[in-house]
Curated annotation (Swiss-Prot):
The keyword Coiled coil applies. One of its GO terms (cellular component) is membrane. The chain crosses the membrane at residues 243-265. It is found in: Membrane. Keywords: Coiled coil, Membrane, Transmembrane, Transmembrane helix. The gene is TMCO5B. The lineage of its organism: Eukaryota, Metazoa, Chordata, Craniata, Vertebrata. It is a single-pass membrane protein. This is Transmembrane and coiled-coil domain-containing protein 5B. Its main location: membrane. InterPro entries: SMCO2/5 (IPR026617). Belongs to the TMCO5 family. The keyword Repeat does not apply. Residues 17-207 form a coiled coil.
Length: 307
């Protein structure tokens, strides 16, 4: 049963771990794509800036050549001054653009740092999730083991209750058999009583008729009376024997009923007397019964307590 309980737990663990890894992989792919896009933008801007710088250098070189050629003329000087001003303006613009690029580079570096922090946080979260899943699996294994132990205990108790129920049903069958036998014995006893009464009436009638009989028939009457007395004694012995059988049968039935009551109070419903006595007895009798049984039910532990 432990192998059957561990397989679904391992499957749940693998599914949970695979789903978490897929989510982390998707997050990493998104972050990598964002980084690549930002780096591409940065490269494009750097290339544009380099082209502009080259163009400006070319213009500066051309202007320098023009300045070298037009040093003699004032107009050329004015133009040169004008060109210088333009060059200064272009240099300012270049400085502004370089400052913007530096700001964008700083922003990109901050974004890269944040992405690295997020990636490290994701890995730490994955480690924490693995620890939590391990703890959950251990708790589930412990609960499963406890449930299997409780199921085994319940099965043992169920088997015990079934055996007790079988014994109780056997007792009930025996009681039904004995009750039938008791009814048959009572029927036979009634029949024998009726026969005894009839024989007594016949003997009385014979005694009454014997008073009018001749003296020669006295011997026959005495023998007949002796025979009747012996039969009556035999019937009395049979009655006493049947009474004894009936008494033993009742004792056995009482013992079986007492055993059934003890079994019921011990295993099925120990609070039967507590539930039934208030319904059967009155309050006064219950109080008197409580007063009588209280000294026997309490434990005398005063001598065992420390002073």
């Amino acid at each position: 049963m432990e192998d059957v309980g561990q397989n679904p737990l391992d499957d749940v663990k693998n599914i949970f771990f695979a789903s978490s890894l897929e989510a982390v992989k998707q997050n990493l792919d998104c972050l990598n794509s964002d980084l690549e896009k930002d780096l591409q933008k940065l490269d494009m801007e750097n290339q544009v800036l380099l082209r502009k710088i080259k163009e400006k250098e070319e213009t500066i070189s051309s202007l320098e050549r023009k300045l070298a050629l037009s040093l003699e003329e004032a107009k050329e000087e004015e133009e040169l001054n004008y060109v210088i001003d333009e060059q200064e303006e272009s240099l300012r613009e270049l400085e502004l653009e370089t400052a913007k690029l530096e700001k964008s580079n700083a922003i990109l570096s901050r974004n890269v740092v944040e992405v690295q922090k997020k990636i490290s946080g994701l890995f730490t979260n994955i480690g924490l999730e693995e620890e939590t899943t391990k703890q959950i699996l251990e708790e589930m294994k412990a609960r499963l083991q406890k449930s299997t132990e409780s199921c085994a205990k319940q099965e043992e108790e169920l088997a015990k209750i079934e055996s007790d129920y079988q014994s109780v049903s056997d007792l009930c069958k025996d009681q039904v058999y004995y009750i039938k036998k008791y009814q048959e014995v009572l029927r036979k006893m009634k029949e024998e009583k009726e026969t005894l009464l009839l024989e007594k009436q016949i003997s009385k009638a014979q005694d009454d008729s014997s008073q009018t009989v001749k003296p020669g028939s006295i011997l026959a009457d005495t023998t007949q009376r002796n025979m009747e007395r012996t039969t009556i004694k035999k019937q009395e012995r049979r009655c006493w024997y049947k009474y004894f059988q009936y008494l033993t049968f009742m004792v056995l039935v009482f013992i079986r009923l007492l055993a059934y009551v003890i079994f019921h109070l011990q295993y099925i419903n120990p609070d039967l007397l507590v539930d039934v006595l208030p319904l059967v007895l009155s309050r006064g009798t219950l109080e008197s019964l409580r007063k009588v049984s209280h000294p026997f039910l309490t434990l005398a532990v005063e001598e065992a307590l420390p002073h």
